[in-house]
């Protein structure tokens, strides 16, 4: 007995996440995508945004190839379309299938970066982290600490995905080349820090490893003598893996974090004020031109 075509149908999001090398992704819920607030600002970053969004949501989208096929229909059907009030878009305004697929994947990646910093998305990514889907840190003293995907920038097209270790605070290139085509912006810069703060057990795992190996830090030696850090060949990244031990150091770290957050807030506020001033200047120039023309 033949199977129902609807039962065999696989949603677009599921197909994308099951592609080779796409197992870092989680499936974004349709409710999240259909909320316009979650898509704010993405229309300017993705070509054929509307068509790409419809593709992700499994709506039928007309492409340039479909338009060329429709041109072979009879004049009778065209007359019926005009009587029914439907209109055909010009072929030059429609994306081809390859461009539409690229735009849909780009849009999904940018939505994915926003989804994984939501409560639902963090929970889904935490499950993958717990299963070690992202791999383990290659550093010996991290004792197989699970890695977290991260992007060095939130702008797509700049750099591919990297893996962050919360234990040594360093980043690594994925060991398999199949992940080197995944854009880092699809995970963003915020996700790793938010995941660590939302799930304190990750910091507890790091603390156990740090305590375990704190007395056995490896250092290069020549004939039994350690190489001085000020030497040209001395260690350079030891500070990156230092953690506060005394109560005073912990308070100092807390103070530095607060000051950093305050500085970031002030910088963002200053940039917003500058943008408002530029908009006011542009409006004044437009008013002056209007008055001059009158």
UniProtKB/Swiss-Prot annotation:
Phosphorylated by alpha subunit. GO terms for biological process: DNA damage response; nucleolar large rRNA transcription by RNA polymerase I; regulation of cell cycle; regulation of ribosomal protein gene transcription by RNA polymerase II; regulation of transcription by RNA polymerase I; regulation of transcription by RNA polymerase III. Residues 273-288 have a biased composition (Acidic residues). The keyword Phosphoprotein applies. It holds the Pfam family CK_II_beta. GO terms for molecular function: protein serine/threonine kinase inhibitor activity. Keywords: Phosphoprotein. InterPro entries: Casein_kin_II_reg-sub_N, Casein_kinase_II_beta-like, Casein_kinase_II_reg-sub. GO terms for cellular component: CURI complex; cytoplasm; protein kinase CK2 complex; small-subunit processome; UTP-C complex. Residues 70-87 have a biased composition (Low complexity). Residues 66-90, 269-294 are annotated as: Disordered. Belongs to the casein kinase 2 subunit beta family. Tetramer composed of two alpha chains, one beta chain and one beta' chain. This is Casein kinase II subunit beta. It comes from Candida albicans.
